[in-house]
Regions:
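Carbohydrate-active catalytic/glycan-binding domains of CAZyme proteins
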Residues: 1-151
């Protein structure tokens, strides 16, 4: 854990498994939101998406822990979210999206990659204090991709 406690600690998160069997977690803390199914129309709207990447810098570790003085994020290390709009026509900027209603899985296709089988579920947006639609999954490199509908 970071000496300055910048990492998530003692947050309970819902765990899901991808179609390939990999565990992934909710982008938001667990709130006991009742499960439900969604339609493609439910997903259209403004989303906040974040992709978690490997840190570009090496860190000194002691027994798996970040050393004192190594806990501050440096330029380029912070994973920043982006706001995107999933349009009702299946477009998202220069990319496209599709939703498998039966399996409740989202796919986003860009010019350079396809992010497949993002798990859609109901959850709580703690920042905006409301129930919302969330997704979690992995990109082709195995990095987490999280999203929450914000409008």
């Amino acid at each position: 854990l970071s000496p300055q406690n910048q990492l998530m600690d003692l947050h309970v998160r819902e765990v899901f498994f991808t179609v390939n069997g990999w565990p992934v977690v909710s982008p938001e803390r667990y709130a006991g939101t009742a499960p439900r199914s969604f339609t493609k129309e439910d997903l259209a709207g403004e989303w906040e998406i974040i992709r978690l990447q490997e840190p570009p810098l090496e860190r000194s570790l002691e027994a798996g822990q970040i050393m004192w003085g190594e806990g501050d994020l440096r330029n380029g290390e912070q994973a920043l979210s982006a706001r995107v709009v999933l349009e009702a026509d299946g477009s998202v900027g220069d990319a496209t999206w599709d939703f498998n209603v039966k399996k409740q899985l989202l796919t986003i296709k860009t010019a350079t990659e396809d992010i497949n089988n993002l798990i859609i579920f109901a959850g709580h947006d703690w920042e905006n204090e409301t129930e919302t639609i969330l997704f979690t999954g992995l990109d082709a490199q195995g990095h987490s991709v999280w999203g929450k509908r914000i409008n």
